[in-house]
Amino acid sequence: MLKRCLWLVVTVLFAWQVFNGTAIAAQLDATTRTVALNDQGKNITLSRRQVEDGQRLFNEACASCHAGGITKTNPSLDLSPETLALATPRRDSVAGLVDYMKDPTTYDGEDSIAEIHPSIKSADIYPKMRNLSEQDLTAIAGYILVQPKVQGEKWGGGKIYF
Protein backbone atom coordinates (compact mmCIF):
# COMPACT_ATOMS: atom_id res chain seq x y z
CA MET A 1 0.00 0.00 0.00
CA LEU A 2 2.79 2.40 0.92
CA LYS A 3 4.54 1.63 -2.34
CA ARG A 4 1.41 2.54 -4.33
CA CYS A 5 1.03 5.81 -2.45
CA LEU A 6 4.64 6.73 -3.14
CA TRP A 7 4.22 5.97 -6.84
CA LEU A 8 1.05 8.06 -6.91
CA VAL A 9 2.82 11.01 -5.26
CA VAL A 10 5.78 10.75 -7.65
CA THR A 11 3.45 10.55 -10.66
CA VAL A 12 1.40 13.55 -9.54
CA LEU A 13 4.53 15.64 -8.88
CA PHE A 14 6.02 14.67 -12.23
CA ALA A 15 2.79 15.49 -14.09
CA TRP A 16 2.49 18.82 -12.28
CA GLN A 17 6.08 19.74 -13.21
CA VAL A 18 5.57 18.77 -16.85
CA PHE A 19 2.40 20.81 -17.25
CA ASN A 20 3.25 23.76 -15.02
CA GLY A 21 7.06 23.93 -14.98
CA THR A 22 7.45 25.87 -18.23
CA ALA A 23 4.52 28.14 -17.48
CA ILE A 24 6.12 29.23 -14.21
CA ALA A 25 9.51 29.76 -15.88
CA ALA A 26 7.93 31.87 -18.62
CA GLN A 27 6.50 34.38 -16.12
CA LEU A 28 9.28 36.95 -16.18
CA ASP A 29 8.54 40.28 -14.56
CA ALA A 30 8.90 43.58 -16.43
CA THR A 31 12.19 44.41 -14.70
CA THR A 32 13.75 41.18 -15.91
CA ARG A 33 12.43 41.76 -19.43
CA THR A 34 13.84 45.32 -19.58
CA VAL A 35 17.11 45.47 -21.53
CA ALA A 36 19.24 48.13 -23.23
CA LEU A 37 17.85 49.19 -26.60
CA ASN A 38 20.88 51.15 -27.77
CA ASP A 39 24.13 52.79 -26.67
CA GLN A 40 22.39 56.09 -25.93
CA GLY A 41 20.88 54.68 -22.75
CA LYS A 42 17.38 53.90 -24.00
CA ASN A 43 15.78 50.73 -22.69
CA ILE A 44 13.09 48.45 -24.03
CA THR A 45 10.75 46.20 -22.07
CA LEU A 46 10.22 43.08 -24.11
CA SER A 47 6.88 41.32 -24.03
CA ARG A 48 6.75 37.78 -22.70
CA ARG A 49 5.92 36.69 -26.23
CA GLN A 50 9.08 38.35 -27.58
CA VAL A 51 11.22 36.50 -25.02
CA GLU A 52 9.51 33.19 -25.84
CA ASP A 53 9.93 33.81 -29.58
CA GLY A 54 13.53 34.84 -28.99
CA GLN A 55 14.22 31.60 -27.14
CA ARG A 56 12.67 29.51 -29.91
CA LEU A 57 14.51 31.39 -32.67
CA PHE A 58 17.80 31.34 -30.73
CA ASN A 59 17.46 27.57 -30.29
CA GLU A 60 16.74 27.14 -34.00
CA ALA A 61 19.37 29.48 -35.45
CA CYS A 62 22.07 30.06 -32.82
CA ALA A 63 22.17 27.37 -30.13
CA SER A 64 24.18 24.88 -32.16
CA CYS A 65 27.21 27.11 -31.49
CA HIS A 66 25.99 29.34 -28.63
CA ALA A 67 24.07 27.01 -26.28
CA GLY A 68 24.18 28.38 -22.75
CA GLY A 69 25.70 31.64 -23.98
CA ILE A 70 29.06 30.16 -24.92
CA THR A 71 30.81 30.23 -28.29
CA LYS A 72 31.91 26.71 -29.23
CA THR A 73 34.37 27.90 -31.88
CA ASN A 74 36.01 30.46 -29.56
CA PRO A 75 35.40 29.80 -25.85
CA SER A 76 37.05 33.08 -24.83
CA LEU A 77 34.25 35.04 -26.53
CA ASP A 78 30.93 34.26 -24.89
CA LEU A 79 27.58 36.05 -24.80
CA SER A 80 27.95 37.35 -21.24
CA PRO A 81 27.15 41.03 -20.60
CA GLU A 82 30.80 41.80 -19.88
CA THR A 83 32.06 40.30 -23.13
CA LEU A 84 29.33 42.00 -25.18
CA ALA A 85 30.07 45.37 -23.54
CA LEU A 86 33.79 45.17 -24.34
CA ALA A 87 33.28 44.44 -28.05
CA THR A 88 33.87 47.20 -30.59
CA PRO A 89 31.27 48.35 -31.38
CA ARG A 90 29.47 47.44 -28.16
CA ARG A 91 27.08 44.51 -28.48
CA ASP A 92 25.35 44.78 -25.10
CA SER A 93 22.14 46.28 -26.50
CA VAL A 94 19.36 45.10 -28.79
CA ALA A 95 20.55 47.45 -31.54
CA GLY A 96 24.15 46.24 -31.18
CA LEU A 97 23.22 42.56 -31.37
CA VAL A 98 20.82 43.10 -34.29
CA ASP A 99 23.58 44.94 -36.14
CA TYR A 100 25.92 42.01 -35.45
CA MET A 101 23.37 39.46 -36.68
CA LYS A 102 23.02 41.45 -39.88
CA ASP A 103 26.77 41.84 -40.55
CA PRO A 104 29.08 40.29 -37.94
CA THR A 105 32.54 41.71 -37.34
CA THR A 106 35.60 40.63 -35.41
CA TYR A 107 35.64 41.49 -31.70
CA ASP A 108 37.65 44.64 -32.42
CA GLY A 109 35.19 45.65 -35.16
CA GLU A 110 37.89 45.81 -37.84
CA ASP A 111 36.82 43.08 -40.25
CA SER A 112 33.58 41.51 -41.42
CA ILE A 113 33.26 37.82 -40.61
CA ALA A 114 29.98 37.29 -42.47
CA GLU A 115 31.47 34.48 -44.54
CA ILE A 116 32.32 32.41 -41.46
CA HIS A 117 29.53 33.44 -39.05
CA PRO A 118 25.79 33.08 -39.76
CA SER A 119 24.20 36.43 -40.56
CA ILE A 120 21.59 38.11 -42.71
CA LYS A 121 24.39 39.27 -45.00
CA SER A 122 25.45 35.66 -45.57
CA ALA A 123 21.98 34.09 -45.63
CA ASP A 124 22.81 32.41 -48.94
CA ILE A 125 25.50 30.40 -47.12
CA TYR A 126 23.59 29.98 -43.83
CA PRO A 127 19.98 29.00 -44.62
CA LYS A 128 18.86 29.29 -40.96
CA MET A 129 19.20 33.07 -41.31
CA ARG A 130 17.14 33.42 -44.51
CA ASN A 131 13.70 33.90 -43.07
CA LEU A 132 14.54 35.98 -40.01
CA SER A 133 12.75 39.33 -39.95
CA GLU A 134 13.76 42.48 -38.08
CA GLN A 135 11.30 41.48 -35.35
CA ASP A 136 12.89 38.03 -35.15
CA LEU A 137 16.36 39.55 -34.77
CA THR A 138 15.04 41.85 -32.03
CA ALA A 139 13.50 38.87 -30.23
CA ILE A 140 16.76 36.89 -30.42
CA ALA A 141 18.78 39.88 -29.18
CA GLY A 142 16.31 40.44 -26.35
CA TYR A 143 16.50 36.79 -25.34
CA ILE A 144 20.32 36.93 -25.27
CA LEU A 145 20.23 40.04 -23.06
CA VAL A 146 17.57 38.65 -20.69
CA GLN A 147 19.41 35.39 -20.02
CA PRO A 148 22.08 36.80 -17.68
CA LYS A 149 19.25 38.13 -15.50
CA VAL A 150 17.58 34.72 -15.47
CA GLN A 151 20.58 32.38 -15.32
CA GLY A 152 23.17 34.62 -13.71
CA GLU A 153 26.78 33.65 -14.27
CA LYS A 154 25.71 30.34 -15.83
CA TRP A 155 24.92 32.27 -19.04
CA GLY A 156 28.22 32.32 -20.90
CA GLY A 157 29.93 30.56 -18.00
CA GLY A 158 30.94 27.52 -19.98
CA LYS A 159 30.88 23.82 -19.37
CA ILE A 160 31.51 24.06 -15.64
CA TYR A 161 27.79 24.87 -15.34
CA PHE A 162 26.45 22.27 -17.75
Swiss-Prot record:
One of its GO terms (biological process) is photosynthesis, light reaction. It is a peripheral membrane protein. Its main location: membrane. Keywords: Electron transport, Heme, Iron, Membrane, Metal-binding, Photosynthesis, Photosystem II, Signal, Thylakoid, Transport. Residues 1-25 form the signal peptide. It is found in: Cellular thylakoid membrane. One of its GO terms (molecular function) is iron ion binding. Heme c binds at C62, C65, H66, H117. One of its GO terms (cellular component) is photosystem II. Its cofactor is heme c. Binds 1 heme c group covalently per subunit. It comes from the Bacteria. Belongs to the cytochrome c family. PsbV subfamily. One of the extrinsic, lumenal subunits of photosystem II (PSII). PSII is a light-driven water plastoquinone oxidoreductase, using light energy to abstract electrons from H(2)O, generating a proton gradient subsequently used for ATP formation. The extrinsic proteins stabilize the structure of photosystem II oxygen-evolving complex (OEC), the ion environment of oxygen evolution and protect the OEC against heat-induced inactivation. Low-potential cytochrome c that plays a role in the OEC of PSII. PSII is composed of 1 copy each of membrane proteins PsbA, PsbB, PsbC, PsbD, PsbE, PsbF, PsbH, PsbI, PsbJ, PsbK, PsbL, PsbM, PsbT, PsbX, PsbY, PsbZ, Psb30/Ycf12, peripheral proteins PsbO, CyanoQ (PsbQ), PsbU, PsbV and a large number of cofactors. It forms dimeric complexes. This is Photosystem II extrinsic protein V. It comes from Cyanothece sp. (strain PCC 7425 / ATCC 29141).
